[in-house]
């Protein structure tokens, strides 16, 4: 998208320096996998540890330099259709609604945004994307989609323990104790920060299993704890993760628009990466719209 991204100042500041994969055998033991046993799709040579928020802000600035209008804080709430059933655009949510659901004195109705083509990029399980898939039967030839929940924390750690560019992935304990599946990551970013988290498949059998608490248990493992001791958590979050892969992709286009990114399900789970494919899907869709 930006071949000269280094010269243009893209916030990719921490190249991957070491790539490690572990299987946690118990609450105290771990087996580091030999590099030759790690699937090639999990290798990260040439990649960067980034803050996706910083990259998205940088991309937003680049878009605005091209006179693209960005409306942060205004989420699309409804799909607008022409009389012939083709997509006309979207309507943003109403503002100034009280807790009882009634308009208040500062009520402002949502804006209608019309376009020749509307591209939907809501992320995993986007509510408008699901309506479009159902309306146009876009998933009739696709495998059922598969989901997980991803829980993430950002920590500031002791500089003596910080190893910029170290990338760690793994599986095993504690999820294997509850018959659950999933995995974890820990990345050493810039400014003495690490990002860490766990993805748990939503097919877990034990109804009492609590993914958030499983992550808290995981942080007590010596492999993880060694970096966090003396540090502090500075932010956290969670989100749904789409995991069905290539065969679960719906048809991407419909009359008046298309689905891109995780709204369609472009996460490449064999690589545990989706930002690359989300961007590429947007680029391909943009080129198709330009040529239409």
Question: What would you call each of these model-derived segments?
Answer:
Residues 10-12, 141-145, 169-177, 241, ...:
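Short Gly/Pro-enriched turn/cap motifs at secondary-structure boundaries
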Residues 16-19, 27-28, 46, 59-67, ...:
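Rossmann-like flavin
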Residues 9, 32-36, 149:
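Low-complexity, highly charged intrinsically disordered N-terminal segments
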Residues 30-53, 61, 89, 199-201:
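Helix-loop-beta segment of a Rossmann-like dinucleotide-binding subdomain
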Residues 53, 57-58, 62-226, 284:
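Predominantly flavin-linked oxidoreductase catalytic cores and closely associated redox partners
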Residues 44-52, 108, 140, 270-278:
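Alpha-helix N-cap/helix-initiation motif
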Residues 1-29:
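N-terminal FAD cofactor-binding segment of flavoenzymes
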């Amino acid at each position: 998208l930006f071949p000269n991204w280094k010269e243009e100042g893209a916030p990719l500041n921490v190249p991957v320096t070491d790539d490690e994969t572990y299987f946690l055998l118990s609450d105290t033991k771990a087996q580091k996998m030999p590099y030759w046993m790690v699937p090639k799709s999990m290798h990260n040579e040439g990649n960067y540890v980034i803050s996706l928020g910083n990259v998205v802000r940088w991309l937003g600035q680049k878009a605005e330099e091209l006179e693209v209008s960005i409306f942060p804080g205004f989420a699309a709430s409804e799909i607008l259709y022409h009389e012939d059933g083709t997509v006309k655009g979207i309507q943003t949510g109403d503002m100034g609604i009280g807790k009882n659901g009634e308009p208040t004195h500062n009520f402002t109705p949502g804006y209608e945004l019309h376009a020749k083509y509307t591209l939907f990029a809501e992320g995993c399980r986007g509510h408008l994307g699901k309506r479009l898939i159902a309306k146009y039967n876009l998933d009739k030839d696709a495998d059922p989609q598969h989901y997980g929940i991803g829980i993430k924390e950002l920590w500031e750690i002791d500089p003596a323990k910080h190893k910029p560019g170290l990338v760690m992935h793994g599986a095993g304990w504690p999820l294997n104790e509850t018959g659950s599946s999933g995995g974890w990551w820990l990345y050493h970013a810039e400014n003495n920060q690490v990002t860490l988290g766990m993805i748990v498949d939503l097919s877990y059998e034990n109804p009492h299993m609590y993914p958030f608490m499983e992550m808290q248990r995981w942080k007590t493992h010596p492999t993880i704890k060694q970096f966090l001791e003396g540090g502090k958590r500075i932010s956290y979050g969670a989100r749904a993760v789409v995991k069905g892969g290539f065969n679960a992709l719906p048809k991407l286009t419909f009359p008046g628009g298309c689905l891109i990114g995780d709204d369609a399900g472009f996460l490449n789970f064999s690589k545990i990466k989706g930002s690359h494919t989300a961007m590429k899907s947007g680029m391909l869709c943009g080129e198709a719209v330009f040529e239409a």
